[in-house]
Amino acid sequence: MNLRTIRAELQQFLQLAIPLAAAQVAQAAVGFVDTVMMGRLGPEPLAAGGLASALFQFILATASGVVMAVSPLVAEAQGAGKDYKIAAIARQGLWLSVLLGLPVMLIISQLARLMPVLGQSATTIALARDYWMAVLWGIIPGLGFAMLRGYVAALEQARIILPLVLFGTLVNGLGNYLLGYGQLGFPRLELTGLGLSSALGLWVMFLGLLAYTAWQPKLRRYPFWQDWRRLQPSICRQILQLGWAIAVTVAVEFGLFTIITILMGAIGVEALAAHQTVSQTIILIFMVPLGCSFAVTVRVGWWLGRQDGLGARRAGLVGVGAIALWMLLLAIPLALFPRAIVGIYVDLNNPVNAGLLNLALPMLRVASLALVLDGVQRVAMGALHGLQDTRIPLLLSLLAFWMVGVGSSAMLGFQLGWGSTGLWIGQSLGVAIAGGLFLQRFLKLTQNRTFKQRLQPQPLATHP
């Protein structure tokens, strides 16, 4: 690698990463807006809504992992000059979004039955159920949008995603105001209204991106809608073979944070509410490396199609370096102004929130120390997805997030009595271990000029 090739790769990366990262931040603003409005409803709706939203996002992110396999497959096909495969992959990805969405909706509708086993209060369960029964109607469009986002990103047509997400977020925020608070003659539905608004925002984004694939001239060259009624099991199997491991890896990663949320609820409503204010802030920040990881997946997948190991290595390291610097810059204000951040969610002058503030401040300090490591692990994982390397990273995720992260969280939080701060320290240790393992795996796989035969992607069973 030399400075010229690094600069060229950085330019390609930023052209793709900036709109994707901005879109992810805007999409996370849906949860941010929901959390702020939950906080204005009171501590109990904030705690219950935070738990309900966290579990919903966990399930949606896990299921989206299956259809996220479309992105590296399309990027590899384009890099190899096999354009005839591209539309077929996307069509079957859309089919899988619908077929997968139906059982996922059923799972969400039954979540409230599990909550007593997890130590949640009756009030928290009742409020959370209201949110779940409304927001579950956003599952199918959420999966469809995730698939189409990967499709257009792999074809370097990602700029449309940001305005679509911004419009969907606007729809969600307006719906929250009207339905959550009962403004302008609408009924006051509180958490039910917030859930319905989130689902509506997902439908707006999905339908907008679906229409864009049929209208945009550079995308129309790929016959996306040709034979769209035809289900092709061979291509679906190809997506599932790659996507199931991505989905489980996402579940393992997000499962750590979901378990921490559940453990916070076992400590108490106040700890859960404090955790929600901190975690929502971190989620918003984390959307930048998440969007950048999609860009790295595309860039590495393109080099995979060209069978160039050094090119893939350069693409991955450029992405990791860029996100590490960005997260370092964001960690500084997080560490210096924690009270101001908590004040976004709750009224600091209200004595009822004093306990929440005392719990949230040390959590934010721990979170600021872990930001860089969190960004590195996510982008390094995206680079591995670009290589279509998923099964070993899944095992590494289990080791880092569950054995180290969950294990140390339980020990520090409960056995040593460190409470909510101990839970945050434990999950940060899991993130740190994951970042090191993923980066080492990526460097090992890209150490040669050409990829080893075992890394060569399997040919898709489709024809021109």
Curated annotation (Swiss-Prot):
UniProt topology in membrane: Multi-pass membrane protein
UniProtKB keywords: Antiport, Cell inner membrane, Cell membrane, Ion transport, Membrane, Transmembrane, Transmembrane helix, Transport
Transmembrane segments annotated in the record for this chain: 13-32, 52-74, 94-116, 131-153, 160-182, 192-214, 244-266, 281-303, 315-337, 352-373, 394-416, 421-443
CDD domains according to UniProt: MATE_NorM_like (cd13131)
Key word S-adenosyl-L-methionine present: no
Subcellular localization, as worded in the UniProt entry: Cell inner membrane
Keyword Cell wall biogenesis/degradation: no
Stretches of the chain forming a coiled coil according to its record: none
BP-aspect Gene Ontology terms: monoatomic ion transport
Predominant subcellular localization, coarse grouping: membrane
Domain of life: Bacteria
Pfam families cross-referenced by the UniProt entry: MatE (PF01554)
One term of GO molecular function: antiporter activity
InterPro entries: MATE_fam, MATE_MdtK
GO cellular component, one term: plasma membrane
Role played: Multidrug efflux pump.
Similarity section: Belongs to the multi antimicrobial extrusion (MATE) (TC 2.A.66.1) family.
UniProt-recorded name of the protein: Probable multidrug resistance protein NorM
Organism in which the protein naturally occurs: Synechococcus sp. (strain ATCC 27144 / PCC 6301 / SAUG 1402/1)
